């Protein structure tokens, strides 16, 4: 109990804010280096292998010889294109790592049996909860930092994305090194 309290004090919204202020104008490489140095071995890198942001982060970590100090993971929803798997396999070969797949507890058939067909159309929040949110929570369990490819130019809701923020839901630091 005492150890958990000390850990909660060490990494909290308050001191993450201080670190975020220090790194707000830093390069992606500097942010990645600082985060890996401070939070490894509990650093997770989410990568969809379907867009450029995650690929850039994996490439940067590899060039900085930091890839072996993080867990690169992806959410295998059961609906990924074969081209996405091809990109992942090529990245794994090129950089010598193996990405961890996190999958929903329900197969697509089980989901349809329990919730009916086309859940994504009728209740997208429930569908994403099953296929993305729950597997992502599993991936982040016990981690201290989560590196994402989120960029401020991706949507109106992401315009104010900080370089570092405390994520209360997962109790870790969420990192956006490519924010600008």
Task: Go through each PLM region and give its residues.
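Nucleotide-activated chemistry modules centered on ATP-dependent adenylation/adenylyltransferase
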Residues: 2-180
